[in-house]
């Protein structure tokens, strides 16, 4: 396991600096490859803004969160799904990979959701204010916009949306789906 700095990642994502982030991923992957890894996963949803470019240069196969989530959305049969995450993830409707489903981002509070997410991810804790922003946005997406489920398209949203605690609407935790795919890949070498 290797860690790409969150602040640098979010800055590269915000600025669309694909080349810089891919270089970080490549160097980390090469270091891990010397330790014997056979596959790599970028576990940050935000970090997938450059995943196609990274796959082209990665010395090992990439377990792609976007592919995993696309399959899970299809498996669950969603036609309209809401989205919470960073500004880029929401504005691009999950990087444009969900072509079989209508993806709805928060309409009036997209920037507020983004700012709450970045604040929470940077601090590593969720405050009551963060929770209120995400719960309000998720509720609006389901009740006002008719979304069948809310995609938790930010790795750190697990700080707010915890197992066994019903937020009042269905969720699809992208990080959880990705973690299951990573575990499956590890067990089926």
List PLM regions with ranges.
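Non-catalytic structural scaffold of enzyme domains
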Residues: 1-189
């Amino acid at each position: 396991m290797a860690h790409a700095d969150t602040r640098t990642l979010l800055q590269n994502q915000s600025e669309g600096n694909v080349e810089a982030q891919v270089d970080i991923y490549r160097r980390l992957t090469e270091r891990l490859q010397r330790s014997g890894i056979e596959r790599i996963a970028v576990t940050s949803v935000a970090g997938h803004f450059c995943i196609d470019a990274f796959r082209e240069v990665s010395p090992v196969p990439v377990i792609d969160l976007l592919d995993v989530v696309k399959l899970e959305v299809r498996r669950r049969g969603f036609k309209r799904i809401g989205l919470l995450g960073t500004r880029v993830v929401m504005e691009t409707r999950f990087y444009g990979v969900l072509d079989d489903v209508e993806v709805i981002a928060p309409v009036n509070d997209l920037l507020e959701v983004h700012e709450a997410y970045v604040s929470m991810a940077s601090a590593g804790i969720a405050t009551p204010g963060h929770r209120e922003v995400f719960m309000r946005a998720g509720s609006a997406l389901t009740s006002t916009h008719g979304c069948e489920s809310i995609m938790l398209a930010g790795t750190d949203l697990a700080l707010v949306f915890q197992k066994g605690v019903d937020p009042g609407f269905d969720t699809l935790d992208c990080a959880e789906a990705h973690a299951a795919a990573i575990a499956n890949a590890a067990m089926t070498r």
